[in-house]
């Protein structure tokens, strides 16, 4: 196998090449230069200098200028040849025994990054990374090293790497074992990390005759920031080295099937290669074999933060930009896999067309009786008695029996609400509504109709604290499924838990007694008999709490977990007496939801609407609340302008009226603010600038 070394022509350190009997086989020299060179290799002084250096090193062997090839993006490569002796002049090859003396140039680091991106994005069908530690030399702690061992697994055992047609090396082929070593540098610069791939990929072909122009076959593109997302903590053994390990074994095998022969369906093969890369990068099971692992120094953290795309939040009190990657909150798997419908608060509603709207309005205004019903169902405000007459509660029989066992008159406290028992297996309370109108979602009006019983999109689950947490410890999955089966159907689920404070106090007392027992056991022998007597007097409820094995301080954490993972709202209450009052308030909230203007007009619900007695009162209140004008100045403006619209007409015309005493009606700052308010089309423009 041959060896490839990346060198910097600006580094003049002399390095001897020691191989078998003083020869070094298969040396490929990579150089970089500033800017792109379109001329032939013979006209390039850098190529001429390199060829001259090679000629001096090999002695009698001739080195042609064609041995040095210029690729795009200022990357030059010389083909493999046997060299005896030493490189001199201004060309040097790095070795692991003696580091180079001069630092790496910025241009060379940029070219090195381009080469790495070119190898990664090209269609090379090469198996990656041999695990043989003896085959790869040790890496110095003073420089960044990029290792990539490429072993052939094709039956022929050889790869032909065709370069662009202008290259004189198209006719030559070798089998390489790459080890790319850079010049010594402590850290990688930001520009070398974010450099885009080169435009001329190395495409694989089994025969020279199957070569295509490199312009016809472009490498598949993917997210250049993908490698940064897969960054892992650095190994302490390479604390001083910023290295990139490319383990692309499975990926290269797939690419060989895609790019082994270049046939006519090039675009299809490129898409398949892109899918292969994307799946390998995002597959959790293949991270060990199909990933790019980036290791960097701790000093590189500042540089890495610069490369991340920050998310700037306007009007934020945070002084530093927020990384968008850190803000990406991953939902639990059960939430991702299931499509939860949005809650639909408006029942018995549908959109009406303009023709249907005109027909319904004509029908509602046809007779006095229909007109009365039409006005009744479109009232803005509803009384509490009207809301309770519309609502129906279906309570589970087990919950009802539990309430009656506590001698609570549940039906009497919720009158005139209609209560019906249901016999479901879950402790659930459902809400229903007697609808005597249908809502037009397009035009925002109600039409009278026959009475229809509709199901509201809210339900209540009632649990006692101790059995709930006991089931959480023994059958968490079943508890999740029981709660979430309602939220998956578009229901808003509310979990009511009674007896939580009593359970917390009992757990605290039990923990204190356990602590006392442990202390007494360590004091005297008589204490052991006392602890045994206490064990005999232990109650059944305390035994259940011991089996619960939950500390009192963890109860709130479990409630938060239920709220997040089960997608519900948890309301702990003291006892069932409090539950009846709580349910009455909940019925009022659910009942008036259908007539709430913020629900009916959701697209305008963010606006704060205030009403006034008259147009003059509206303008007077506006000047005080929005324009921050005191009462005398507001009254002065209102004496001339009687409405908000009259002032707007004058502002758009470009003038403001004077007062009766021939003095300005308002201050200049207020004029500018009102003119901006009336004429601006930019929602982000400031009204007051001083």
Curated annotation (Swiss-Prot):
Residues 181-210 have a biased composition (Polar residues). Coiled coil: none annotated. GO terms for cellular component: nucleus. InterPro entries: ERCC4_domain, XPF_nuclease_EME1_ascomycetes. Residues 524-533 have a biased composition (Low complexity). It is found in: Nucleus. The keyword ATP-binding does not apply. It comes from the Eukaryota. Its cofactor is Mg(2+). Residues 181-216, 521-543 are annotated as: Disordered. GO terms for molecular function: DNA binding; endonuclease activity; metal ion binding. Keywords: DNA damage, DNA recombination, DNA repair, Endonuclease, Hydrolase, Magnesium, Meiosis, Metal-binding, Nuclease, Nucleus. One of its GO terms (biological process) is DNA recombination. Its EC number is 3.1.22.-. Pfam families: ERCC4. Interacts with MUS81. Belongs to the EME1/MMS4 family. This is Crossover junction endonuclease EME1. It comes from Kluyveromyces lactis (strain ATCC 8585 / CBS 2359 / DSM 70799 / NBRC 1267 / NRRL Y-1140 / WM37) (Yeast). The lineage of its organism: Eukaryota, Fungi, Dikarya, Ascomycota, Saccharomycotina. The gene is EME1.
């Amino acid at each position: 196998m041959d060896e490839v070394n990346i060198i910097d022509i600006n580094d003049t350190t002399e390095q001897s090449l020691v191989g078998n009997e003083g020869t070094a086989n298969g040396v490929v020299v990579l150089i970089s230069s500033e800017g792109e060179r379109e001329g032939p290799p013979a006209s390039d002084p850098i190529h001429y200098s390199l060829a001259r250096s090679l000629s001096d090193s090999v002695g009698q062997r001739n080195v042609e200028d064609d041995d040095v090839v210029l690729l795009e993006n200022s990357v030059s490569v010389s083909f493999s040849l046997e060299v005896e002796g030493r490189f001199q002049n201004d060309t040097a090859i790095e070795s692991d025994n003696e580091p180079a003396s001069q630092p790496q140039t910025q241009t060379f680091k940029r070219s090195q990054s381009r080469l790495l991106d070119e190898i990664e994005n090209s269609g090379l069908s090469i198996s990656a990374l041999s695990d043989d530690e003896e085959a790869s030399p040790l890496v110095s702690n003073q420089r960044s090293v990029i290792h990539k061992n490429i072993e052939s697994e094709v039956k022929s055992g050889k790869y032909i790497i065709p370069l662009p047609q202008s290259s004189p090396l198209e006719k030559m082929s070798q089998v390489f074992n790459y080890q790319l070593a850079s010049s010594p540098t402590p850290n990688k610069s930001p520009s070398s990390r974010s450099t885009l791939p080169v435009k001329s990929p190395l495409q694989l072909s089994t025969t020279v005759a199957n070569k295509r122009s490199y312009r016809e076959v472009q490498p598949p593109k993917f997210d250049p920031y993908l490698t940064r997302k897969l960054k892992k903590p650095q190994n302490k053994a390479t604390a001083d080295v910023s290295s990139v390990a490319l383990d692309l074994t499975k990926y290269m095998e797939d690419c060989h099937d895609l790019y082994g022969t270049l046939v006519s369906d090039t675009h299809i093969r490129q898409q398949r290669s892109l899918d292969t890369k994307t799946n390998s990068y995002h597959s959790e099971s293949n991270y060990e074999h199909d990933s790019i692992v980036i290791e960097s120094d701790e000093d590189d953290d500042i540089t890495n933060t610069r490369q991340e795309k920050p998310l700037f939040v306007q009007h934020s009190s945070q002084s530093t930009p927020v990384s968008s990657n850190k803000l990406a909150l991953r939902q639990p798997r059960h939430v991702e896999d299931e499509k939860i419908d949005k809650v639909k608060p408006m029942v018995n509603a549908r959109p009406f067309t303009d023709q249907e709207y005109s027909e319904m309005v004509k029908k509602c205004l046809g007779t006095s009786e229909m007109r009365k019903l039409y006005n009744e169902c479109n009232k803005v405000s509803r009384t509490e008695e009207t809301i309770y007459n519309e609502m129906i509660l279906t309570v589970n029989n087990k919950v009802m029996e539990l309430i009656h066992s506590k001698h609570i008159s549940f039906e009497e406290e919720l009158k005139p609400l209609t209560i019906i028992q249901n016999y479901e297996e879950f402790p659930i309370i459902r809400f229903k509504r007697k609808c005597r109108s249908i809502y037009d979602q397009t035009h925002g009006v109600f039409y009278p109709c026959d009475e229809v019983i509709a199901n509201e999109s809210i339900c209540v689950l009632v649990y006692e604290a101790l059995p709930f947490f006991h089931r959480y410890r023994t059958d968490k999955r079943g508890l999740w499924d029981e709660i979430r089966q309602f939220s998956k159907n578009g229901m808003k689920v509310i979990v009511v838990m009674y007896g939580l404070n009593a359970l917390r106090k009992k757990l605290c007392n039990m923990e204190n007694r356990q602590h006392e027992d442990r202390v007494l056991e360590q004091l005297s022998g008589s204490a052991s008999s006392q602890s045994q007597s206490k064990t005999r007097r232990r109650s059944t409820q305390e035994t259940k709490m011991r089996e619960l094995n939950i500390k009192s301080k963890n109860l709130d954490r479990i409630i938060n977990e239920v709220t997040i993972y089960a997608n519900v709202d948890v309301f702990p209450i003291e006892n069932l007496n409090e539950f009846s009052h709580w349910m009455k308030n909940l019925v009022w909230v659910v009942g008036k939801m259908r007539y709430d203007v913020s629900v009916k007009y959701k697209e305008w619900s963010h606006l704060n609407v205030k009403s006034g007695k008259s147009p003059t009162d509206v303008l007077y209140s506006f000047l005080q609340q929005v324009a921050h004008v005191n009462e005398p100045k507001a009254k002065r403006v209102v004496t001339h302008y009687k409405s908000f619209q009259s002032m707007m007409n004058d502002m758009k015309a470009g003038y403001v009226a004077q007062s009766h005493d021939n003095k300005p009606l308002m201050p200049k700052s207020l004029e500018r603010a009102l003119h901006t308010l009336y004429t601006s089309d930019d929602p982000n423009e400031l009204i007051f600038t001083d």
